[in-house]
Amino acid sequence: MKAEISRRSLMKTSALGSLALASSAFTLPFSQMVRAAQAPVEEKAVWSSCTVNCGSRCLLRLHVKDDTVYWVESDTTGDDVYGNHQVRACLRGRSIRRRMNHPDRLKYPMKRVGKRGEGKFERISWDEALDTISDNLRRILKDYGNEAVHVLYGTGVDGGNITNSNVPYRLMNSCGGFLSRYGSYSTAQISAAMSYMFGANDGNSPDDIANTKLVVMFGNNPAETRMSGGGVTYYVEQARERSNARMIVIDPRYNDTAAGREDEWLPIRPGTDGALACAIAWVLITENMVDQPFLDKYCVGYDEKTLPANAPRNAHYKAYILGEGPDGIAKTPEWAAKITSIPAEKIIQLAREIGSAKPAYICQGWGPQRHSNGEQTSR
């Protein structure tokens, strides 16, 4: 009698045979290893924060075994609701255990013992490190003065409450001062410009988008630059759902903030946002779409009426835009089109949308001000 064996029955038989082997005495050593691995190990969760040169300082819940972080959890407390969202860390925070557990991480003071660039260091005690730093600091202050000490702020943990730049600043001020700096590589120009334009650097919250009909973003890309616990991208989307606002993204690159969520993307030549803003103002002025009572009440130097008495004639903003100022150049859409590479008809359309939307949410990112004359772009 000849039995026929199908491919399926052969696979079933092989699987059963493998299962029998897996449960036989051959696996006893491995079974012991499994039981040993399952032995109770003390585990705890501690709260920390993410300090990676970012101001969000997101909450992190670190799960620790054998004094080693093996899992990082973000904020899971409370109810994640609009207006009171959870502070969820981005990928930098969620992967921070790789930074903490990295073999090249400096855990102790290291003193150079060779020439610069040789990479020769030896471990020293904290007491020796503090004595070395304080002795050299006293020597430099005595021999060269306080201006010989410059404190940098890009430390990698500058965003922390305890680890931020104010701590060494306070220390050096207590010693008589130090060589400081103006601004920062992040926001130097926009910080200076906004203080002159608005008196402060504070703006309104993204949740104000819920009250608008139009959102215009000049070089603002929160999906890639504000993806941390501030939750700006998520906030923007939630607010837009409430207002159904039209969103226009102005950026040289089709960025992640747009990514199909935008209603219109206007690619612009880098660093020319200021010219676009001037052309928008030209349309608003010439088509009588400005809020004149608001300008008269809150603005200085918009036109001749609010120009300071000692200012030259036609030195006001309106004259500059219309070409009646010292440069004699009218900031028309055609003028801006040659600079920005945005067609004049698109500029006119954008200006009319801004002028007719009541209210509109207009914001700018930090990218446009990181160019020469960036403070003028911000203004």
Predicted regions and their residues:
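Long, well-ordered, tryptophan-enriched scaffold segments
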Residues: R242, R253-A357
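N-terminal export/assembly segments and adjacent metallocofactor-ligating motifs
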Residues: M1-M289
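Acidic catalytic cores of enzymes that act on phosphate-bearing nucleotides/polynucleotides
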Residues: G355-R379
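Conserved short loop/turn motifs at secondary-structure junctions
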Residues: L152-G160, W335-I339, G365-S372
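Short coil/turn segments at secondary-structure boundaries
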Residues: Y144-G154, G183-S186, Q292-Y298, Q349-A351, ...
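A generic alpha-helix surface/boundary motif
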Residues: S165-N166, A330-K331, R379
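Glycine-centered helix-coil hinge/cap
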Residues: Y144-G145, G176, M197-N201, R313-G325, ...
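Short, hydrophobic/aliphatic alpha-helical segments
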Residues: A37-V41, S74-D79, E324-I329, G355, ...
